[in-house]
């Protein structure tokens, strides 16, 4: 069993983490650290948090045995932790509830957040609506285009969505703008960061709120898996909050492999990916030291992923630490492989996953073939794919207009063909990229 106690009092996970912020934010960070230290083990705070998780979110989320997929892939049995069934459709709500509760106790009435895929923005807007808090969400304009359903959901919930036009117009830039807002409005504003990154105490705090995922799995998996824990836990990694939420309770279980799946984009050697743990170097980004995709001059480089939620040049510092000590492994899945897994899960199990989650599903499908049938893989299905339908339709060349029902037929570019002419990606001749 691992003896694991991280971070230290200064928020360091080995050489990673810490708090690198402007002088303007030092007081706000210290105020947040003090508040979290006060409430993180407070019985009333925890009772309210658990009440919200049960009655508002709908926890515990179930574990589902993907039996048909397991049979077709061969090898290990594949199980899915169904975070997609949470209220708002992803794991993000676990964290936003905890931080919003903390904000109320600190007397903050204005909430800001950053979002990539839009799920954290929706979760933040949702809890702000529930608690009657002002909500402003920063989102890269590129992500606004590819995640438009979530933008409208945020508007319906009363949030102001601010498109960010700087840089690559994605998650990194949204986080930069949110930080600027916090500096300008520090007295009345609470920043709900959506991932296990940022200055201390955010990586620890977000991990703690998300650890409900793995804690539930510890009791659920033996019921599903003949009394045993999984041989491997697989989760997608952008900033890394869903992965850390399921990994952390399993760190002490050294017979369970922890595997994080990064966005390999067009290939790890293409320069068009978001795989900071595999191609990055240690550096400081958004208030913490971690692995960062950067050039020889230390400038943060542009990233790419089919998935807006994984399109980020850094990663949570605890993931960096787990990589260095060898407790977790990190691999890459390309856009094409993720898209194939997206279609395959839809058609095999009747579950539409988020494109982020599809990266984890894709790797689990590969991994299962290398394992025995009496072994098991637990995949964190971090979110549902409603938000990605437009992106997937565009990439598949689907045309939803001016045609009769195509039930039972494959569709590409509005032309019906037999299902046999399509592979698991839903596109003729599509193959995985190396």
Swiss-Prot record:
The enzyme's first-digit EC class, named in words, is: lyase
Q: List-wise, which residues carry N6-(pyridoxal phosphate)lysine?
A: 92
Pfam families linked to this entry: PALP
Region feature Disordered, mapped onto this chain: 411-434
Molecular function terms, GO-annotated: tryptophan synthase activity
UniProt keyword list: Amino-acid biosynthesis, Aromatic amino acid biosynthesis, Lyase, Pyridoxal phosphate, Tryptophan biosynthesis
Q: Which Gene3D superfamilies match?
A: 3.40.50.1100
Zinc-finger found in the keyword field: no
Co-factor requirement: pyridoxal 5'-phosphate
Q: Quick check: keyword Chloroplast in the entry?
A: no
Q: Which family does it belong to?
A: Belongs to the TrpB family.
Tell me, in a sentence or two, what this protein's role is.
The beta subunit is responsible for the synthesis of L-tryptophan from indole and L-serine.
Q: What protein am I looking at?
A: Tryptophan synthase beta chain
Q: Which organism is it from?
A: Polaromonas naphthalenivorans (strain CJ2)
């Amino acid at each position: 069993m691992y003896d694991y106690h991280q971070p230290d009092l200064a928020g360091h996970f080995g050489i990673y983490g810490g708090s690198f912020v402007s002088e303007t934010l030092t007081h706000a960070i210290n105020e947040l650290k003090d508040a979290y230290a006060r409430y993180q083990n407070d019985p009333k705070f925890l009772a309210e948090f658990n009440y919200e998780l049960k009655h508002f979110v709908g926890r515990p989320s179930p574990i589902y045995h993907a039996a048909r997929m397991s049979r077709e892939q061969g090898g290990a049995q594949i199980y899915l932790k169904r975070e997609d069934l949470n209220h708002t459709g992803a794991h993000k709500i676990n964290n936003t509830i905890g931080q919003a509760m903390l904000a109320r106790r600190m007397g903050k009435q204005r909430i800001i957040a950053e979002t990539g895929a839009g799920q954290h923005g929706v979760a933040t807007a949702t809890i702000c609506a529930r608690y009657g808090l002002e909500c402003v969400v920063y989102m890269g304009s590129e992500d606004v285009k590819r995640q438009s359903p979530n933008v409208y959901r945020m508007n319906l919930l009363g949030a102001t969505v601010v498109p960010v036009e700087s840089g690559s117009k994605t998650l990194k830039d949204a986080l930069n703008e949110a930080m600027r807002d916090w500096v300008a409005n520090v007295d009345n504003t609470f920043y709900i960061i959506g991932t296990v990154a940022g200055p201390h105490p955010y990586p620890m705090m977000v991990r703690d709120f998300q650890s409900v995922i793995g804690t539930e799995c510890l009791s659920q998996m033996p019921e599903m898996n003949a009394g045993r824990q999984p041989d491997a836990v697989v989760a997608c990694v952008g900033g890394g909050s869903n992965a850390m939420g399921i990994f952390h309770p399993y760190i002490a279980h050294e017979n369970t492999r922890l595997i994080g799946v990064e966005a390999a984009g067009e290939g790890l050697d293409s320069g068009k990916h978001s795989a900071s743990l595999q191609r990055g170097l240690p550096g400081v980004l958004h208030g913490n030291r971690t692995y960062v995709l950067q050039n020889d001059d230390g400038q943060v480089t542009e990233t790419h992923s089919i998935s807006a939620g994984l399109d980020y040049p850094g990663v949570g510092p605890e993931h960096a630490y787990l990589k260095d000590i060898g407790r977790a492994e990190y691999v890459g899945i390309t856009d094409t492989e993720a898209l194939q897994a997206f279609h395959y899960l839809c058609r095999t199990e009747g579950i539409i996953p988020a494109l982020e989650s599809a990266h984890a599903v894709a790797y689990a499908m590969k991994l299962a073939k290398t394992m025995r049938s009496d072994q098991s893989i637990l995949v964190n299905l971090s979110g549902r794919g409603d938000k990605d339908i437009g992106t997937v339709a565009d990439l598949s060349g689907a045309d939803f207009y001016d045609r009769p029902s195509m039930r039972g037929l494959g569709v590409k570019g509005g032309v019906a063909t037999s299902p046999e002419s399509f592979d698991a990606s839903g596109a003729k001749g599509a193959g995985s990229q190396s």
